[in-house]
Design a protein with these regions (language model features):
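Conserved glycine-rich acetyl-CoA-binding loop
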Residues: 74-92, 113-120, 124
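Extreme N-terminal starter segment of soluble prokaryotic enzymes
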Residues: 1-3
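Acetyl-CoA-dependent GNAT
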Residues: 6-13, 17-82, 91, 97, ...
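Amphipathic, positively biased hydrophobic alpha-helical segments used for protein targeting
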Residues: 67, 85, 96-98, 109, ...
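C-terminal "cap" of GNAT-fold acetyltransferases
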Residues: 104-108, 112-119, 124-128, 132-152
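Generic secondary-structure boundary signal with a strong preference for alpha-helix termini
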Residues: 72, 86-88, 97, 130, ...
């Protein structure tokens, strides 16, 4: 059973130190100390971050960012806990948090098209791909992404 709370300062340092291998290395983050200097990512006060635990293990985090008509949903997993079955449960909890904070607003996310494991997880949680894949540049580099939406 996952538990969660608002992400603490200490957790922001821990999460941004997570390192991924292979194709997933695009998800390696800028260190939190650097984010604090620029007001980016975990240092942006408009972001709503939550940390998820399985017992004493920090396994995931989410970010909810309210926009005018919808809410951006970001998700991250501790590298050693990827593919362990937490994704759907955590996504359902994230949807519940979103409905509580931002009632009536749909959620959306953007996921790299090659990340089939994540796409399947989001589809099982009720997200659907909208439109054609889009090429964009993010803080993690260039990529081709699906835009996925879950109605409010």
């Amino acid at each position: 059973m996952l538990t969660y709370h608002k992400t603490t300062e200490e957790e922001k340092y821990r999460i941004t130190a997570w390192k991924y291998d292979g194709d997933y290395a695009v998800y390696n983050s800028t260190p939190y100390a650097q984010q604090k200097q620029t007001g980016f990512g975990f240092a942006n006060p408009k972001n709503h971050f939550y940390s998820f635990y399985d017992g004493a293990d920090l396994v995931r985090f989410i970010n909810l960012y309210e926009e005018e008509t919808e809410v951006f949903f970001g998700i991250g997993a501790a590298p050693e806990h990827c593919g362990k079955g937490y994704g759907q449960q955590m996504t359902r909890i994230a949807c519940s948090i979103c409905r509580s904070l931002f009632p009536g607003k749909p959620m959306y996310l953007e996921v790299r098209t090659w990340n089939r494991r994540a796409v399947r997880c989001y589809e099982k949680a009720g997200f659907r791909i909208v439109g054609e894949p889009i090429r964009q540049t993010t803080s993690a580099g260039d990529g081709i992404f699906y835009h996925m939406v879950k109605d409010a």
